[in-house]
């Protein structure tokens, strides 16, 4: 090894420097001087990372965020992960290195284990405030977040149908996001209150990858069977 140092010594030295905040390492990218990363504040840029941009409530959500940021002299940096963990991690690395004053983020596949917690720890280290919306990783329950009452919503819509005299109620829930898990809880609660047995054949779980095909296919199958 150059300079006559063993690899073990080099790794130990880098570990000490990283622990003291002098350097920052990114998997697949390399090791960088932390002085560069400390220049991230004062940019006036607030990053908004969502799973989708044009679907569901996101257009209005993003519009509202942008209006508030603009009124307060900030600029928005918009990123769309497509609910991909890999994209989320890549965007976080990019945003940290380029410089942001804050982050609003909807986590990707929030019900699954987050394997890039270290990137959020980097945000904490450099005192970059961030807040989760729409979902929250299980490992980060203590972090600032704004969530809808998905369990309550699942309960209310199911209860409405039951109160209307319906008994054969199917439920479609997303398995890899927190919202789907919580809505399922509400669905189950409403059935239990009306003393209706839970039927797993009436529950369809789908994932990000098959969200555009599986629900429609299962609806057609259910209609044919009835």
Residue ranges, per PLM feature:
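N-terminal helix-turn-helix DNA-binding module of bacterial transcription factors
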Residues: 1-41
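Amphipathic helical "hinge" segments at domain boundaries
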Residues: 37-102, 109, 188, 192-193
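Bacterial carbohydrate/catabolite-sensing allosteric modules
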Residues: 20, 67-75, 90-101, 114-226
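Residue-level marker for beta-strand->alpha-helix junctions and adjacent short loops that shape enzyme
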Residues: 30, 53, 110-111, 137, ...
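A short, flexible N-terminal coil/short beta segment enriched in small residues
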Residues: 28, 40-49, 163, 168, ...
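Short, flexible, glycine-rich and Lys/Arg-enriched loop motifs at helix boundaries
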Residues: 37-43, 106-120, 207
């Amino acid at each position: 090894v150059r300079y006559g140092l063993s690899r073990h010594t080099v790794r130990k030295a880098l570990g000490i420097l990283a622990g003291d905040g002098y350097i920052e390492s990114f998997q697949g990218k390399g090791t960088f001087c932390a002085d560069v990363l400390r220049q991230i504040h004062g940019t006036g840029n607030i990053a908004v990372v969502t799973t989708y941009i044009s679907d569901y409530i996101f257009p209005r959500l993003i519009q509202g965020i942008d209006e508030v940021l603009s009124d307060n002299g900030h600029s928005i940096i918009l990123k769309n992960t497509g609910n991909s963990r890999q994209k989320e991690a890549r965007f976080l690395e990019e945003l940290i290195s380029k410089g942001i004053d804050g982050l609003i983020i909807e986590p990707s596949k929030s019900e699954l284990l987050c394997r890039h917690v270290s990137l959020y720890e980097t945000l904490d280290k450099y005192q970059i405030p961030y807040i989760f919306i729409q979902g929250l990783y299980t490992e980060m329950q203590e972090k600032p977040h704004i969530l809808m009452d998905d369990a309550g919503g699942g309960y209310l819509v199911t209860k409405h149908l039951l109160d209307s005299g319906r008994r054969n109620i199917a439920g479609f829930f997303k398995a890899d996001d927190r919202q789907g898990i919580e809505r399922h809880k509400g669905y189950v609660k409403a059935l239990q209150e009306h003393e209706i047995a839970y039927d797993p054949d009436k529950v369809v779980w789908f994932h990000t990858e098959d969200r555009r095909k599986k629900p429609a296919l299962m609806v057609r199958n259910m209609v044919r069977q009835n």
